[in-house]
A protein has these predicted regions:
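Sliding clamp-binding short linear motifs
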Residues: 1-131, 195-197, 206-207
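Flexible, glycine/threonine-enriched loop-and-boundary segments that flank and lead into catalytic domains
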Residues: 116-154
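Coil-to-beta-strand transition motifs
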Residues: 4-6, 137, 165, 189
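Short beta-strand segments
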Residues: 140, 166-170, 203
Length: 207
């Protein structure tokens, strides 16, 4: 992300907007590392640049600015490479990079790319699991949104997971938590087998 002062610089100099990463670097006075972070976060889409193309352009322009002797001789363009068309980044990789930089993605959900494999293994979407009949045993998987271990819950852990279809609420008993503690407490994606428990119109999957 950006520091507060970096964001203020960017906003103060934007005027009618920025046309290229170079104009952003020049007008806002942002450093190359800051522009690289913006490129990695796919922030240059409005300029018609993909994440990979933006990184390439930022690094190339920054390198060009470090040759004052050539610039003074009017030779700044000498030795520069011809335009390169970069291959598109696979959509799954784009989504992963979105999560690494912004903790979310508007392109797709990471679990979408596992759906075909999960279907073959009998792992159902969270929405289907949450709507299953009371007492049914299910297998589902999702990205961890929330972990809670209230002091009054006698060691029980409550976890909310999410996939591209919705969310499911998990109840993890102490014996299960102790058996799988590193996974339960730290994993970003959880696969769970449990029994559906519905009471007062609230559904949990009890692991």
């Amino acid at each position: 992300g950006l520091r507060q002062d970096e964001m203020e610089q960017l906003m103060a100099a934007r005027g009618a907007g920025y046309e290229t990463p170079e104009s952003l670097m020049r007008r806002a006075g942002l450093s190359r590392p800051v522009l690289e972070r913006l490129a990695a976060a796919d922030a240059f889409g409005s300029m018609g640049l993909s994440r990979r193309s933006a990184l390439w352009k930022v690094r190339g322009e920054a390198a060009g600015r470090t040759l004052p002797l050539f610039a003074a001789a009017g030779l700044a363009g000498q030795g520069s490479e011809a335009g390169v068309t970069l291959p598109l980044i696979p959509r799954s990789e784009e989504v992963i990079q979105d999560y690494q930089t912004a903790r979310l993605s508007l392109k797709d959900h990471p679990m979408h790319f596992l759906r075909e494999v999960h279907a073959r293994r009998g792992i159902i979407p969270t929405r289907e699991a949450a709507q299953s009949r009371n007492g049914r045993r299910v297998r589902t998987s999702g990205l961890v949104l929330v972990r809670q271990q209230p002091g009054t819950a006698s060691g029980v852990v409550f976890i909310t997971i999410e996939d591209e279809t919705g969310i499911a609420n998990l109840v993890v008993w102490p014996r299960v938590k102790e058996r799988f503690r590193p996974v339960i407490m730290r994993a970003r994606i959880l696969h769970v087998r449990g029994r559906v428990q519905t009471a007062d119109n609230v559904t949990h999957i009890v692991a």
